[in-house]
Amino acid sequence: MDSCCVSVNNKTHFNDSTSSSDAADVLIHSTRAGRDEIQDKSQNKVNIYIRRLSDSEHVHSADERRTEIPPVNLPTASDTAGPEEPLAGIKSNQFAGLFGKTSRKEKSKAQSTIMQTEQLKSKGEDVQISTFSADGRGVVSAALRKRSQGAPIRRNVTVQVLDQDRSQTPAGVQPDPAFPLGDPGTSASVAAITAATLAATAPLMKAQSEMEAQISRVSAELKRLQAAEGSVPPGRTARTDSSSAGRAAHLEEQLNILIQQRLQHLETIQCQQIQLQNRLLGSALDVVASRGNSSGVSQTDSLPLQISGNRSIRLSATDNPSAGRPASVSMDVYRERQTGGHKSPLETPAPRKVIPKPTHWTSSTSTNRPPKSSFKNQGNGRLQDQSPNNRRSPERCALQSVGVERFAMATADNSQPEQSRESQMPSKASVTRSAQEDGSSFVNGQNEQERQGEPTNVSSSSTTVQKASEMLQDLGRLKNEMRSLLQTADAFPVPNAKSTQSSRSRHLAPVATAPPPATAPISMPPEPVDVIAVRAAALNRASVLKSIQPPTSMFEDAGLVLRQVRQSKKTLEENLEAILRAKDGEVLHTQLEALSKNRDVREELRIKKTVDAWINTLSKEIQDDLARESSERIVDAAVSRREAGQRTRAEASAAAKKTSVRAQAGNTRAHTRQPAPAVRNKPAVKQEATQPIVLKSQDDEEYLARLYGKAIYDGQRRTLKKSPYLRFNSPTPKSKPQRPKIVETVKGVKMKSSKTQTSQYVGDVSAMQHSVSEPHFIFSPSDPDKQQQQPGSPVRGYLIPMAIPLGKPRVDCQPPVPSRVIITDKPAIVTTSFPPITVVESKPTPAIRKPNAILLEVQSAPKKRTPQLQIQVQPGVNIESALCSSRQASPTPVIPAESILPPPSIHATEDPHAHEDQQENIFPGTNFLAQADISQETNGGLPDSPIEFKGLPSPPADLYHGPVFPPVPTQSTPLTEPILNTIQQRETLENRLVDWVEQQIMARVITGMFPQPAQADPVHQSEPENSVASDIVEAAGGSGLQLFVDTGVPVDSEVIRHYVNEVLTEIIASMLGQREAQGTPATLVQTQDAQKEDTTVPTPAPTPEPSLKDPPSPVRTPDLSEHLSTATSPEKPPQESASPGPDRIPVGTPITTPIPSPTRVATPSPPTPANQSPEPGSLQIHLWEGSELPLEEEEQPELQPAPVVISVPRVDDQEESVIHPSSPVLSKPQSPPAPPLPPVIQKSESSSSSSSSSSESSCSSSVTVTETETAARHISEGELLLNHGQMAAVRVLEQEGVLLPNFMTSLNGSLHGVQDMDYDPPSEGQVIRAPHLPAHHDPVLSLLARMELGPISQSQQPEGWWEEESSGEVSEGQRPVLTAAEEIVLTGHSLMDQQTIRQSRNTQISPHATLTSPGQVIAEHTGAVVEDGGLSVNLRSSDEQKEAMVYQADTVSSPQPESSQMAQTVHRPAPILVRQYEEEPDFPQLRRLSDDAFFGADEKGEDTFLHTGEGGGGGRGSDVRVMSVRLPSVKQDQESVSLSSVEGDTDSSANDVF
């Protein structure tokens, strides 16, 4: 607010801060401008300091309202008179105050003018004069928002004409205490004039500031010119000195003249404005004063009205024509609002007004009692606010103030001139004081104005300011005089003399501090009738004087502050009380609930006793009622009706008793946690019959109303109101109060359970007890079950189910009662009520409870039970027990047994307590619950009683089913869930089946389409796909693609084929799994051609990646070439046949082209020999999952490497060839598995790879597979290879020392998984380069044998391999096609020729080139535990090995290309026997060298049983040490040499398991 600074003095005034701590105060404080800020304001900006005129604070409101326009308004005056300058601000403030409180008419005018002026000023300086009444808090908040946004606040300032005194002060400076402050016309005119004056002065001020700025600029320019002239060269200076000096002098003269003229003009304009203001104020005051004087008493009468109505704003303007001083208008919000506001609330209690005012008038009491009145006023009018009170008071004041104001007028008229003068003199301070007095911080206001005056001192209007300040001081004197007079007048009503002097002293000093007295005159004058009103009038006038009076004693200020504080405190306390009452109600309810839940056992017992007594009394009544009802209706209908009627009677009797009892014991207990039980007992008694229910609802309502003080709701509506019962509320209470009561009970339990649950539950229990004869039984069974559910307690059992279905309970209200009372008559109703309870607690009930009425109707009406007596008896018992059982998930059959009424009735009596205790089982209620349960059991045990009552146990069962009917939906809901689940499962299965069938069909279609492409090339599946695409294009070109062709775009058959191939490939991959779909064609082509062509191709996998898995297995198969056989065993030929495996270049190491040794097929049982070459096929088979064709093709393409697998360059093949002679692999274990595996391709491949560890060894270089009969042994140890179910495969695995557990875990087959479970150290694809990774060589071989796959590097095929035999499982690099050397390394030593392998190994292994097959363990690492495998590798002596079925794992190392720099030593894994060989092998040298090289080259090595041949040809392995190691998954990709083709063959999964 650059242009307009609204500073609100924080000075607390009795009316300002404390009495009205509202948005207005906030606005004032928030908008308050610091004095420093005020001083800093530029003169071109108009600073208006606004004090909120609290509606009740009329005394200080004028001062508060003082809007100071310090620098611009009075620039000259401020300059001339700094101290008086605040007066100028005060004047403006007074002006603002004058037009701040105007009549509505005047307000409209003033608003228009003010708005205009503000708009004018907003262009330059925004002058915002805001007057906020305590009433319009919303407006204040809006204003605050606007101000916070910085937008100028255009607020209409309503000026309260405080007194005629002001109007008289201009002429006679006589403030009429009774002058009609609120004359609408006068106040409006004054406001309009003031607004006009402000609007006129603002431009002048702005012009003055602008002129000053221009002058400063001209002077600065002159100085600059002078400086420039000084800098002129001497010659030119000499020339120009004279001219320039003349020009400068001329300019200076002109400037001086201009400045003087401008200043004179501004001063003239300012003087004119001041005079104008004085005239306006004087005229307004004169009008008011003339009215006040002329009208005399009538004016005094009107004044209180207007004053109070207008909020009694006093304008005290001393118009001294001689002095020409601007009349200082002091706007005072009359204390009238404080006092009047106090009165307004207190006006109702006049004595209070009298009391506080006399105290106020008394110097000692004046400060104190006004606060009391203000407290009472605000307290009573807390909602009313002081301002409305004042407005109210104005009327009374108008009446009362007539006499008071007359009296005050006489005194005021006498003293007004002086007071006005005094007030004028202090008006400088008075304006500040008015704020100070109002804010009870006189010093602060003065300081602010003084500071504000300081900037005005700079202005040239200081003289005017001084004059204005003098006039204000005069006005202040007059105000003081008038205050004293008014105070004396006010004092007269009570203590006139004391009040006069004390009021003078206080009003002189505390006039500001005692706004209540000042306000009282204003607000009181409207009440001339009362002496208090007279006092109020005097006080109001005093407040006017007060506002004028700047010097109020600090004590008076303190008194005002205290009063304000008291008033605000009162208001706050009342508000707090209201809030606390609301909260206390809630707390009370919660406490009552807690008490009901936590009541002591003693209390419960006592309550139960009381309840039992009531039940006994009520039971008789109920029985009578039941008999009556039975006679009226059928036995049940009549009984229910009679119960309703007699229950009403019983309620009358019991109501008196229960009412007294509840009022006494019930209410006390409610506070002591017992009242709820008492209430419950009573309602239980009432609920015994249909009427007991009504009694319960009525009593509960009354009791709750007493306890909670909630009489707001009708008992019925109250309960219904909370819940959906409202529907039934109006009808049920009218037609059948019993039914609504029932509803209330049901919902009351729920709804009240949170608040009044205890009482209601107690009522339910008592009702149960009362209906013990018949209904009790029903309630008792339901109670134990329902105890958990208070609503479901006996009352719940009956009433709740009934209450929940309110609509039907109206019709069926009696049946539930008969169910309680008369078992025979309305079992359906009872059942219905209970089932709802059951439903509520157990399953769908919550919804059912609401419809319970409906259910009740349906069940009661249909009930389908011809024998009503029987039906009611059993259903009632059954229902409650059933409800309990249903809650307990007990079947309905329990109900018939429970149908026995007598024990239930007894228990029912207990049950109410149980229900009371239901909330807390700790209390005897738990015992009652147990008893209730017992009663239910008794009912079950005593089916006779229900039979006796109803005579037919079977009908009760039907009835029970009927009542169950409502719960049936609840059950149906739980049933629906399982049904839905089953349906969903079925649908899911069906969908999966459909998908599977579709996939199978697609697979067949694709296979039919792909067999040719599959044959085309394993690597070049794209070719077969293209052929297929061509076919597709041909087929689709005509029709299938007709749409595309029809588009008019020429169709390219090749493009179509390409897209079709891609789509088919994707579909096939998704359908068959990319592994299978790609594997089959890849395997066919690859197996045939890949051996020759693919040896170099790393992974010519068919488009689907799964083919990658295939090649590793075929690679391993070729890896087992005879070259290895040369090293260790005759099986070398099978290994050589497997050597086509080198075509499995996919093996991580470049595939050496070992001579494929078809002889490897020697042992069909361990398909390894066949597998080694077929392994690619077998891998492909894995892709195709069960097709044996790949196996056949494997045999054919043994020479054909499976290109699909990532193949290392043929260097591997060379390595294989190099390595093959090192260790031939047993052909038998290799060959046998291959044919058997077709059914289980993965397993067979694994078995072949494992069984033909030799085959792997052949692929990896040389693997000696020694077939030993210990295979069975190893199978047991390492788990049998169940892939083919062939002992040969198992033998091969055992011989290989492959750990079957790896296969089991890795293989998809359950058997494989079982076997592998025990030993699963390395992950499938892992290659153990480091010693910690060594894995059993045997597991790899066993995997190969099982899988019937050529040895595949374990690292590459472990995951997919064991899961699916398709080669696709093997990730590229895990199981690339292995060279013979690689396969040997991976496969490990064949059991067949361990010694030979050792020899070859010794010869071939170079310390750096030697690689331990994944199964091998380096001697250095003996005793090392394979981390991946999780198995400890223990190297033991050959003796121990023999003990444990010693298997010599021959490590065959063939020198491999330096690129790989890894001699793959194939260690025949030691027997998979659990035993670990402790002896340290002599092979640490060989195997250590090999392992070092192997591990160094391979990141992961597979631990294997390293058996140094005892008589090893190598010679080094003189000591045969078996190291049982789990093969960690080998990463063949990392190693050029496939570390464990054996493990890989077995299934990379096995390695993964390891």
From Swiss-Prot:
Pfam family, one: TALPID3
One GO-annotated biological process of the protein: cilium assembly
UniProt biased composition (Low complexity): 1240-1265
Entries under InterPro entries matching the protein: TALPID3
Chief place of localization: cytoplasm
Transmembrane segments: none
Disruption phenotype: Homozygous for these mutant alleles complete embryogenesis normally, but manifest a cystic kidney phenotype during the early larval stages and die within a month of hatching. Elimination of maternally derived talpid3 activity by germline replacement resulted in embryonic lethality of talpid3 homozygotes. The phenotype of such maternal and zygotic mutant show absence of primary and motile cilia as well as aberrant Hedgehog signaling.
Subcellular location: Cytoplasm, Cytoskeleton, Cilium basal body; Cytoplasm, Cytoskeleton, Microtubule organizing center, Centrosome, Centriole
Location of region: Disordered: 57-84, 227-247, 312-396, 411-466, 489-523, 639-687, 1079-1178, 1214-1265, 1354-1374, 1500-1554
Keywords in alphabetical order: Cell projection, Cilium biogenesis/degradation, Coiled coil, Cytoplasm, Cytoskeleton
GO cellular component: centriole; ciliary basal body; cytoplasm
Biased composition regions of type Basic and acidic residues, renumbered to the chain: 57-68, 639-650
Disulfide bonds: none
Residue runs in coiled coils: 204-270, 556-586
Region (Required for centrosomal localization): 553-639
Compositionally biased residues, Pro residues: 513-523, 1099-1115, 1230-1239
Taxonomic superkingdom: Eukaryota
Composition bias type Polar residues, residue spans: 312-321, 360-391, 412-447, 454-466, 1080-1089, 1535-1554
Function: Required for ciliogenesis and sonic hedgehog/SHH signaling.
Family the entry assigns: Belongs to the TALPID3 family.
Name this protein carries in UniProt: Protein TALPID3
Species lineage: Eukaryota, Metazoa, Chordata, Craniata, Vertebrata
Gene field: talpid3
